Amino acid sequence: MSNKELIKKFYNEVFTNRDLSNLDDYMADDYRQHSPEVADKKSGFIAFIKQFWQFNPKIEMLAVTSDENIVQVFFKCTLKNGHVNKVCDIYRIASGKLQEHWDVIEHNVEDKKTVSGNSIF
């Protein structure tokens, strides 16, 4: 399975289907997190995702790109309160598993206009 396929499958199972039963297949035991609100390791991710699910997020994947062992996911996230966030998740893949994660999040962007007139992404 390619790194892009791994990420797409991970997002479908975890973010869309809210299923953590195969998390060991996707995430390294020593998963390293750089997001300011999420702790390291699988346990940190599990604590975060269970809290995140309470917002009933709807994920619309916009693009998945990769360069060797780095995969970027661009998506739109609509929360139950109507807020729309645009997110870029960046993963480092090692030995077929998510090893490290960074993210960039633009919060509540649907009504924001850029100076250029272009969309945020």
Predicted segments with their positions:
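C-terminal and inter-domain tail/linker signature
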Residues: 1-121
